[in-house]
């Protein structure tokens, strides 16, 4: 199954919230009516059942991190076998994806752009090039832009903007060297509050 490459607004309208797929500081314009679902009858957004709410939350989480269904289900299975809260484990596994860490460190303006940088071998981990977007970054790992890619204007622009917005507590970034340290796995309290991972757990627990 191919990745969705259509309008970002359509995905956000489907979920009824801005998924921030357009990058830092670029919220959806006013033409994107988040209170209406896409399609001819979008103004008649149906009241969802419990199952519908669970499904929508799963789709929202998948789309935020850009993960396909089979891979997302595998993340859930892994999370359910780990100690602690399955929902928190799931979010932490998604946050530890290399493409997400590249995005969090500001090397990519969006997760999609970060994924492209990884696949094009523009990123290295602990001095070694890694081109697998799903690679699980470990605490203390050093993630950096490879020397040959440091002149890319899009990376420079993204870093400048990210520095203005600030970096998450669990990463430490040296913008001049274009490298960062993944200091620790983020706690649930440090992650977006608008995600209700318990609905995803309920969905897959059936």
Curated annotation (Swiss-Prot):
One GO MF term on file is: rRNA binding
Q: Which residues form a coiled coil?
A: none
Give the intrachain disulfide bonds.
none
Q: State whether it acts alone or in a complex, and with which partners, per the record.
A: Part of the 30S ribosomal subunit. Contacts protein S5. The interaction surface between S4 and S5 is involved in control of translational fidelity.
S4 RNA-binding domain boundaries? 96-157
- Function summary: One of the primary rRNA binding proteins, it binds directly to 16S rRNA where it nucleates assembly of the body of the 30S subunit. With S5 and S12 plays an important role in translational accuracy.
Q: Which organism is it from?
A: Thioalkalivibrio sulfidiphilus (strain HL-EbGR7)
**Pfam entry (one):** Ribosomal_S4
Q: Which GO terms describe its biological process?
A: ribosomal small subunit biogenesis; translation
GO cellular component: a single term: small ribosomal subunit
Its family remark reads: Belongs to the universal ribosomal protein uS4 family.
Q: What is this protein called?
A: Small ribosomal subunit protein uS4
What keywords were assigned to this record? Ribonucleoprotein, Ribosomal protein, RNA-binding, rRNA-binding
């Amino acid at each position: 199954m191919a990745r969705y490459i259509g309008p970002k607004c359509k995905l956000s309208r489907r979920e009824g919230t801005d998924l921030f797929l357009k990058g830092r500081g670029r919220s959806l314009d006013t033409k994107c009516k988040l209170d209406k679902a896409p399609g001819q009858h979008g103004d008649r957004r149906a009241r969802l059942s419990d199952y519908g709410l669970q499904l929508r939350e799963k789709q929202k989480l998948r789309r935020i991190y850009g993960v396909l269904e089979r891979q997302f289900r595998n993340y859930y299975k892994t999370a359910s076998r780990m100690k602690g809260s399955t929902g928190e484990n799931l979010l932490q596994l998604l946050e530890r994806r290399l493409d997400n860490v590249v995005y969090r460190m500001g090397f990519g303006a969006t997760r999609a752009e970060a994924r492209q940088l990884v696949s094009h071998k523009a990123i290295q981990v602990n001095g070694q090039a890694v081109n697998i977007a799903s690679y699980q970054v470990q605490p203390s790992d050093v993630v950096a832009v490879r020397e040959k890619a440091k002149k890319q204007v899009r990376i420079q622009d993204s870093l400048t903007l990210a520095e203005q917005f600030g970096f998450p507590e669990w990463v430490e970034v040296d913008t001049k060297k274009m490298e960062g340290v993944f200091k620790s796995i983020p706690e649930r309290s440090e992650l977006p509050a608008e995600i209700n991972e318990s609905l995803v757990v309920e969905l897959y627990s059936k």
